[in-house]
Amino acid sequence: MAHKKGASSSRNGRDSNAKRLGVKRFAGQVVSAGEILVRQRGTRFHPGTNVRRGDDDTLFALASGRVRFGRSGKRRAVSVDT
């Protein structure tokens, strides 16, 4: 058995907490203004009508209505139909 821990084993053993990213409200769901629709890093989804992007790229509803996922050119977009 080794009497020393080896190259880097004592320096390993850390991990960051999960960030709970992903789609929070799915297509067809009814949402209120201010509800978070998608939590993301970068713009995997882009904001469509009645949706804005927060500082951390989170998409949230500006108005109450029904969530719709679609395309805006080549981009995937999230909209809220009132």
UniProtKB/Swiss-Prot annotation:
Keywords: Ribonucleoprotein, Ribosomal protein. It comes from the Bacteria. Residues 1-21 are annotated as: Disordered. Belongs to the bacterial ribosomal protein bL27 family. PANTHER family: LARGE RIBOSOMAL SUBUNIT PROTEIN BL27M (PTHR15893:SF0), RIBOSOMAL PROTEIN L27 (PTHR15893). InterPro entries: Ribosomal_bL27 (IPR001684), Ribosomal_bL27_CS (IPR018261). The keyword Metal-binding does not apply. One of its GO terms (cellular component) is cytosolic large ribosomal subunit. One of its GO terms (biological process) is translation. GO terms for molecular function: structural constituent of ribosome. The keyword Ribonucleoprotein applies. NCBIfam families: L27 (TIGR00062). This is Large ribosomal subunit protein bL27. It holds the Pfam family Ribosomal_L27.
